Amino acid sequence: VDRHDNSPPNGRTVSKEEMEKDVQLMKSLNINAVRTSHYPNNPYFYDLCDRYGIYVLSEANVECHGLMALSNEPSWVKAFTERSENMVRRYKNHPSIVMWSLGNESGNGINFKSAAEAVKKLDNTRPTHYEGNSSYCDVTSSMYPDVQWLESVGKERLQKSQNGETVKPHVVCEYAHAMGNAIGNFKEYWETYERYPALVGGFIWDWVDQSIKMPTPDGSDYYMAFGGDFGDTPNDGNFCTNGVIFSDRT
């Protein structure tokens, strides 16, 4: 599952107790892997994943949504590369980390190639991941593929491996968008994952609804507020409420 830091009373500041509650809930729901979308997490969260046995796809804090142009701008190569390097240096001794992600939805360019090479120099024991371009990474990746496309990828790589060719594993870093009454076709997705060895699984978008605890006008109760509840215009409405569980962890 993909996880953002969110605490209803404290926003992006998540307590140790809330982190542990998240990990315990993941275990109870048979979730075995978490992607730190889209930034490295508090060191204590990695400690918890080590302790409870949760695989981690640790993601660097690199994203330039929108134009996605910075990844091919040479003046930004140091910023891209150093963020991945800092992540690896800080967290490389956590056994829960099984893969490094160079960033999220930032287009494709020379800066990610530089980051991938830098990560390999620091740690050549773990595979690298970036959905925007897998040519310089150890796995290929996709977001929100349909089951038929995923089936075609698995079938093609199975045939190639049977012919003696080397194929990369495929990771679906976001799928089954959990907004409203969603996570459709989950059974079909997992039948496909289990049918083909090259399909190593995927990360549901996302773990928990992001909202802020707000008191009612008379102060007698509270509600979970999101876009538009703060007098903000324009806003994204309920687009941040797309978690597997509610923001109060129920």
Give residue spans per PLM region.
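An acidic-aromatic substrate-binding cleft motif
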Residues: 1-33, 37-41
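Substrate-binding/catalytic cleft of secreted carbohydrate-active enzymes
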Residues: 23-26, 33-248
